[in-house]
Amino acid sequence: MLDRETSRDDVAVQTIHVMQGAYVASDDPNIVYTTILGSCVCTCMCDPIARVGGINHFLLPYAGVTKVENLRYGYHAIEILINSLLKLGANRHRLEAKLFGGGSMTLQLGAVGPANAVFAQKYLRDESINCVARSLGGTRARKIRFHPTSGRVQQMFLTEIEQLPPESPRVRLRRGAGEVTYFDCDANSDPAAFGKEMR
């Protein structure tokens, strides 16, 4: 399910919110995808030469013993995202991925977030897809803005919906990995308002 809205930053840009269990892909430079993550993981993927990209939002790595083709599960969500990009003209060998989410949000969710993060990284390694940036783990929710044709990502941490004691999220970026922007958002901030970019 997708929610659409017009960006307040640029009326020419269409913002599409990606819900849990969904994926989208596009070659339209006027589209920006957003999603909010807790224990879920999203894969932002782009072919920077063909200028096509897409994003998914999955809840669990696997469906268990039964293989169910459902976008809530990482193995299917990443596979279908790759296929959708290839249909738009991407070259599999040029695909670049960025991973976000996988937080430990509540005790009830246990190791769901870390399991999602481990799965996504292993899947990309096994498929020989270059993971150029990642921000995984921690205890805070994240809001992501992804520009599919450039691969540019903005990330904002949402402290107002924390459910566990604060802890610095584990963030790892490769040198020269492309552009990822990080923001902190306190309890009095508007989660939809992204501040100045930090480089």
Swiss-Prot record:
GO terms for biological process: chemotaxis. CDD domains: CheD. This is Probable chemoreceptor glutamine deamidase CheD. Its EC number is 3.5.1.44. InterPro entries: CheD-like_sf, Chemorcpt_Glu_NH3ase_CheD, Cytotoxic_necrot_fac-like_cat. It comes from the Bacteria. Keywords: Chemotaxis, Hydrolase. One of its GO terms (molecular function) is protein-glutamine glutaminase activity. Gene3D superfamilies: 3.30.1330.200. It comes from Cereibacter sphaeroides (strain ATCC 17025 / ATH 2.4.3). It is an enzyme of class 3 (hydrolase). It catalyses: L-glutaminyl-[protein] + H2O = L-glutamyl-[protein] + NH4(+). Belongs to the CheD family. Probably deamidates glutamine residues to glutamate on methyl-accepting chemotaxis receptors (MCPs), playing an important role in chemotaxis. It holds the Pfam family CheD.
